[in-house]
């Protein structure tokens, strides 16, 4: 049976349009959450919850006990930096030549619309005669904090399986590198720049630190690749200098995380390097830590956390992955089994909580955050069928 007739395709498209029409930069996702709540309640979801951060969670309960499958998608987007660069209004949801245009179409309101509708269709077609529970979650603040708001979702749901809806061109993702933001600080002694010998220049100390860090060899994983450590910015204090020897300097590094790496194992080689530098040159004073982020949620609450988001990887031969592939093959889909090249909420579900997790989403990864972002309507329909098949695979 083809579960996605023309009326249902239109329903998915209309829901995606409605979500796109709601501007939802990080911390301002309330409008999208309200639209999802409206759709869920209109279609008989058993429960709709909005947590302290503003995550919205819909639940459909099967008639028999069983596993819990959670479909996760973030509902925040990056800002539109230059509206004049857009041919189509980023918040109108215009359809042109088989493409739906707008901020968040590919990243990732199209996926959220598709799996929310798929849950509705699955419940109706089965008359809820399935074991277990389906949850769909619209998660906030992912663009700032991959996985931090998702912690609240998994505490509420306690899922057995998670499906991340991030863009994959409808291929199946079974892992990703994680990400950490590492801060290295050097501390000097201020002095007038006319008499620099009376102070200690924190920037010169940082130059030595940066050069030493460049000598570190990245760890490597046979599937996920290198645990890259890349310098992304340096700032000194005071700035502007105004004839003052800088007494403080801060460098930020982007570190890509591999499976099994911990906060301690990631910082240890940098700390050892700093200890060696400080032992050789008493003028150098330095420390290393993870960046801490704090953001305001649309609910008024604050979300906060260290910027450390673990990597994760499952085996293609794991039973739950094979079950999913079997159902996808049954509807004529033959996805590649690969890994995401970017960080997702899977950092929490799989990396921190150890929950069986896969990713599948519509559209291309490289359309995220672009001017004139779009999603092909054919991809919306295809992934809706995929999510329906995955529900069948996990809830049996």
Predicted regions span which residues?
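Secretory-pathway/membrane protein signature
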Residues: 1, 6-14, 18, 42-44, ...
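Metal-dependent amide/peptide-bond hydrolase catalytic core
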Residues: 183-396
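Acidic/histidine-rich catalytic neighborhood of metal-dependent amide-processing enzymes
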Residues: 108-176, 181, 395
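Hydrophobic/aromatic beta-strand patches that form the interior of the parallel beta-sheet core
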Residues: 69-71, 137, 161-163, 282, ...
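Acidic/His- and Gly-rich active-site-bordering loop/insert found
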Residues: 1-101, 124-130, 364
């Amino acid at each position: 049976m083809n579960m996605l007739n023309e009326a249902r395709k239109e329903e998915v498209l209309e829901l995606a349009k409605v979500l796109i029409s709601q501007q939802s930069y990080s911390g301002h996702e309330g409008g999208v959450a309200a639209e999802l709540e409206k759709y869920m309640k209109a279609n008989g979801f058993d429960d709709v919850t909005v947590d302290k951060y503003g995550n919205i969670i819909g639940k459909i309960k099967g008639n028999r006990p069983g596993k819990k499958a959670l479909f996760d998608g973030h509902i925040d987007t990056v800002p539109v930096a230059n509206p004049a660069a857009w041919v189509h209004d980023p918040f109108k949801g215009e359809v042109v030549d088989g493409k739906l245009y707008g901020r968040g179409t590919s990243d990732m309101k199209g996926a959220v619309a598709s799996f929310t509708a798929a849950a509705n269709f699955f419940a109706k077609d089965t008359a809820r005669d399935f074991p277990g529970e389906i949850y769909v979650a619209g998660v906030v603040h992912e663009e700032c904090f991959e996985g931090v708001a998702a912690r609240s979702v998994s505490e509420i749901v306690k899922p057995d399986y998670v499906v991340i809806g991030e863009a994959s061109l409808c291929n199946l993702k079974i892992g990703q590198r994680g990400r950490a933001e590492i801060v290295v600080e050097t501390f000097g002694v201020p002095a007038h720049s006319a008499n620099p010998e009376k102070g200690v220049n924190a920037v010169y100390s940082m130059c030595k630190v940066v050069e030493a860090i460049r000598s570190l060899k990245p760890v490597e994983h046979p599937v996920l690749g290198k645990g890259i450590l890349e310098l992304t910015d340096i700032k000194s204090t005071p700035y502007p200098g105004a004839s003052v020897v800088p007494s403080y300097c801060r460098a930020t590094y982007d570190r890509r995380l591999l499976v099994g790496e911990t906060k301690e194992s990631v910082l240890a080689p940098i700390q050892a390097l700093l200890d060696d530098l400080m032992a050789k040159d008493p003028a150098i004073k330095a420390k290393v830590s993870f960046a801490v982020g704090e953001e305001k949620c649309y609910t008024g609450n604050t979300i906060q956390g260290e910027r450390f988001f673990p990597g994760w990887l499952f085996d293609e031969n794991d039973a739950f992955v094979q079950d999913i592939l079997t159902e996808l093959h049954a509807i004529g889909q033959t996805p590649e089994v690969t890994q995401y090249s970017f960080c997702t909420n899977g950092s929490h579900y799989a990396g921190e909580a150890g929950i069986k997790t896969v990713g599948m989403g519509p559209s291309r990864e490289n359309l995220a955050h672009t001017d004139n972002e779009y999603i092909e309507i054919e991809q919306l329909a295809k992934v809706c069928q995929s999510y329906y098949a995955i529900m069948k695979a996990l809830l049996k």
